[in-house]
Curated annotation (Swiss-Prot):
The active site is at E107. The gene is rpiA. It comes from the Archaea. Disulfide bonds: none annotated. Coiled coil: none annotated. Belongs to the ribose 5-phosphate isomerase family. Homodimer. Its EC number is 5.3.1.6. Substrate binds at T28, G29, S30, T31, D85, G86, A87, D88, K98, G99, R100, G101, K125. It catalyses: aldehydo-D-ribose 5-phosphate = D-ribulose 5-phosphate. CDD domains: RPI_A (cd01398). Catalyzes the reversible conversion of ribose-5-phosphate to ribulose 5-phosphate. It comes from Pyrococcus abyssi (strain GE5 / Orsay). The keyword Isomerase applies. This is Ribose-5-phosphate isomerase A.
């Protein structure tokens, strides 16, 4: 099984948690894109009804509309029943790093409010500790980026401003901010680090998602595996 197939079987497994009348947080990224398309197919076939999707980014909003999923913003719904999203790293306690797609702030706002947060990954994303392979993305107020990069050196982080691809200059988030990618030596206490990073003035949100995932569905070469907290 290749990586795309692993992502797809994880996405398919998540459909088992979807019921009529649900408000669903729609994450960002290539794995969640499979879920959004499959959810759209379910709606078209009449297998589920009265679904509302709350997208976490322009990417997921456009894809949800294209897939025939009715969408709303967070302030238009009373509650989020379930949220489904990908991740860049998952540690053994199901703490996450997210934000490669620069959508971490809306993802955290929506997913922290969900009745159930389901994470979809392929087996490459499982790590022994956070920051083993990937940096922590940090959304920052543009003017503050240099001061924050300097401040991150206290944590021995290698931090750099994320630059655009097919765009000159830095990546601009859906909220009009910059992203700093900070590679820490390792993160032993994700909750503590998540809180600490958010106390730096100018930081809008960071990509450590500690103690928030309820279920992680992993696509592996052998099939799908479900991890629960
Ligand atoms: C976007 C994210 C993504 O969910 C994460 O980067 C995983 O993406 P993919 O499924 O494409 O590997 O956090 O901000």
């Amino acid at each position: 099984m290749n990586i795309e197939e692993m992502k797809k079987i994880a996405a398919k497994e998540a459909l088992k948690f979807i019921e009529d009348d649900m408000v669903i947080g729609l994450g960002t990224g290539s794995t969640t894109a499979y879920f959004i398309r499959l959810l759209g197919d379910m709606i078209k076939k009449g297998e589920v009804s009265d679904i509302v999707g709350v997208p976490t980014s322009y990417q997921s909003r456009l894809l949800a509309i294209e897939s025939g999923i009715p969408v709303a913003t967070l302030d238009q719904v009373d509650a989020i029943d379930v949220a489904v999203d990908g991740a860049d790293e998952v540690d053994p306690n199901l703490n996450l790093i997210k934000g490669r797609g620069a959508a971490l702030t809306m993802e955290k706002i929506i997913e922290s409010r969900a009745g159930m947060f389901i994470v979809l990954v392929d087996e490459r994303k499982l790590v022994d500790y956070l920051c083993q392979k990937m940096p922590v993305p940090i959304e920052v107020i543009p003017q503050a980026w240099r001061a924050i990069v300097e401040e991150l050196s206290i944590f021995n982080a290698e931090a750099k401003l994320r630059m655009g691809v097919n765009k000159d200059g830095p990546v601009i988030t859906d909220n009009g901010n910059f992203i700093i990618d900070a590679k820490f030596p390792r993160i032993d206490d994700p909750l503590d680090m998540e809180i600490e990073l958010n106390t730096i003035p100018g930081v809008v949100e960071n990509g450590i998602f500690a103690d928030i995932a309820d279920i992680v569905i992993v696509g592996t070469k052998e099939g799908v595996k479900t991890l629960e907290r």
